[in-house]
Amino acid sequence: MEALNTPLLKENPVTIQVLGICSALAVTSKLEPAIVMGLSVTIIVAMANVIISLIRNTIPMRIRIIIQLVVVAALVTLVSEVLKAFAYDVSVQLSVYVGLIITNCILMGRLEAFAMQNKPWPSFLDGIGNGLGYAMILVIVAIVREIFGSGTLLNIPVIPQCVYDAGYINNGLMLMAPMAFFLIAIIIWVQRAKDKSLQEN
């Protein structure tokens, strides 16, 4: 279970390993696309880890990256088509970003660092753990950005009208991509403040 638990906090792929930052900028202005993106990456990382782990002993080292990319590309295409079929509106919001999962550093990093050296079940848990760790950060950032940027959560108003009547206005800055950087930086700061072993000299 360590492979599942470690990536959630101690070795979070976004805040500790600093991977997958680009999509954190792109899809976190609203909670719904952030959830879908997080779940999509989780499924793809887990399945890709299992597939690569199953065939790891038959992959020539010289072309292993190409094979890993082919596996990931096939899974991303499958997930993209499923989203278009069952969640078209979200698929449109995510647009090219689902396709860019292929180049997500988290996927290639786990395939290369873990799946190529481990059996399918630990690889599956590692994929789920890293995917959920990634999704967790996306969801946290998206919740803050949507509430303060739009006054909604999952497109449902959460700030009472009386607050607006008192003079409050939504913070448009929260909907700009750089705010995701600032929020992730705050999460990293909190993590490192709580865990001294993460601090660099």
Give the role of each language-model region.
Residues 6, 10, 53-57, 122-130:
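Short amphipathic alpha-helical coupling elements at transmembrane boundaries
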Residues 21-25, 41-46, 73-80, 102-106, ...:
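Hydrophobic core segments of alpha-helical transmembrane domains in multi-pass membrane transport
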Residues 59-72, 93-99, 126:
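Cytoplasmic-side transmembrane-helix entry/capping segments in multi-pass membrane proteins
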Residues 31-47, 67, 91-102:
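Structural signature of hydrophobic alpha-helical transmembrane segments
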Residues 8-26, 38-42:
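The first (N-terminal) embedded transmembrane alpha-helix
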Residues 78-93:
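Transmembrane alpha-helix boundary signature
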Residues 2, 124-201:
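C-terminal transmembrane helix-loop-helix hairpin of multi-pass membrane proteins
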Residues 48-61, 108-118, 190-192:
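C-terminal ends of transmembrane helices
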